[in-house]
């Protein structure tokens, strides 16, 4: 049993445990918020998707056979998984109809990635899709960078709203916000390089796992600090948005009780 297989197996167990923890934390929240719960299950499905990716790599040996084959499988699964994480973060941050725009853009990028993969296979009759791999990588970077831009913009707006309207402890929210941006930025900077080199994967891979763990812990902590009275702040914000956009949507806010 080689070191690559052991690393992939460890990553599989890690993702599976994280998915279970995030899912089971639903049982320990004091108050249920629908918007947060939607984000919770997006994160759970993203963790399961990443776990499946490692099962595929172990079962078929793509990474063990060649770095290029491993990279193709990585991007094909990483793109929708990180899109789910990005949409989960954005779903909590915004109370506006921009959620629909975010979902459409991320969905379009994922569809384009899958289409490039299929076209590459049909042209080259193998997983060595050559230029298709780099197009998929560009689409992955576009997805992550777009998510970062949209999330940071909403975080700034939301932080200002909390500072002016809520007399509560913002530390859980700030920790979650920083962890969210960090995991996406770290992925954007490291994934394009790491997936092409198994050697770098042994170095950077554990750091990515730690970043994901920190994000999941802050995500769970954010849900445990939700109080229903704070939802009135988002309702007021929604009413203002309804006047400007004409869309209808629901929401909640996540703060620690005073």
Which role fits each region the language model picked out?
Residues 90-99, 208-234:
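Alpha-helical transmembrane segments and their immediate juxtamembrane interface regions
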Residues 218-258:
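Membrane-proximal linker segments that couple transmembrane helices to downstream signaling/catalytic modules
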């Amino acid at each position: 049993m080689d070191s690559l297989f052991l690393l992939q197996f460890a990553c599989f167990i890690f993702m599976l445990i994280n998915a279970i923890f995030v899912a089971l934390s639903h049982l320990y929240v004091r108050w249920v918020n629908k918007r947060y719960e939607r984000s919770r299950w997006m994160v759970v499905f993203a963790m399961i998707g990443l776990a499946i990716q490692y099962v595929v790599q172990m079962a078929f040996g793509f990474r063990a056979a060649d770095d290029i084959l491993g990279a193709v499988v990585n991007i094909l699964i990483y793109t929708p998984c990180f899109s789910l994480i990005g949409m989960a973060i954005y779903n909590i941050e915004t109370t506006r109809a921009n959620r629909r725009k975010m979902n459409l853009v991320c969905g379009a990028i994922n569809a384009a990635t899958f289409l490039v993969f299929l076209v590459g296979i049909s042209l080259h009759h193998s997983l060595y899709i050559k230029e298709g791999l780099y197009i998929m990588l560009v689409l992955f970077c576009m997805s992550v960078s777009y998510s970062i831009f949209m999330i940071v913009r909403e975080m700034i707006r939301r932080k200002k709203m909390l500072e002016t309207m809520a007399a509560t402890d913002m530390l859980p929210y700030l920790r979650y916000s920083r962890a969210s941006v960090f995991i996406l930025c770290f992925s954007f900077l490291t994934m394009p390089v790491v997936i092409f080199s198994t050697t770098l994967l042994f170095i950077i891979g554990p750091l990515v796992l730690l970043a994901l763990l920190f994000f999941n812990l802050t995500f769970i902590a954010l849900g445990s600090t939700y109080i229903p009275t704070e939802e009135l702040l988002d309702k007021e914000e929604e009413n203002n948005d309804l006047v400007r956009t004409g869309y209808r949507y629901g929401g909640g806010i996540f703060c620690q009780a005073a």
